[in-house]
From Swiss-Prot:
GO terms for cellular component: plasma membrane. Its main location: membrane. Pfam families: Pheromone. It is found in: Cell membrane. Keywords: Cell membrane, Lipoprotein, Membrane, Methylation, Pheromone, Prenylation. This is Mating-type pheromone BBP1(1). Signal peptide: none annotated. It is a lipid-anchor. The keyword Lipoprotein applies. Activates B-regulated development. A lipid is attached at residue 73 (S-farnesyl cysteine). GO terms for molecular function: mating pheromone activity. Residues 74-76 form a propeptide.
Length: 76
């Protein structure tokens, strides 16, 4: 398990078929984002900024830009 998967396990469904459920309309995405709670990765002091950006870039590339990783990459 990589560090990004460990920080955001809900982005990596175990069951087949759930991947399509993660990519929905903007309202679906907004509702999911509003209800999600995350501890800030920065608050853990576990990863350097360069490490976090590398993790996000890998996740962005792997998922094709259709997940929360894309938003984190834009913010970063």
């Amino acid at each position: 398990m990589d560090a990004f998967t460990a920080m955001f396990p809900e982005l990596f469904p175990i069951e087949e078929g759930l991947e399509d459920a993660l990519v929905g309309s903007l309202s679906d995405t907004s509702a999911a984002s509003a209800s999600a709670t995350h501890t800030s990765p920065a608050s853990t002091d576990t990863f350097d900024d360069a490490d976090i950006l590398a993790i996000l870039a890998d996740a962005e590339h792997w998922r094709g830009g259709n997940t929360t990783a894309h938003g984190w990459c834009v913010v970063a």
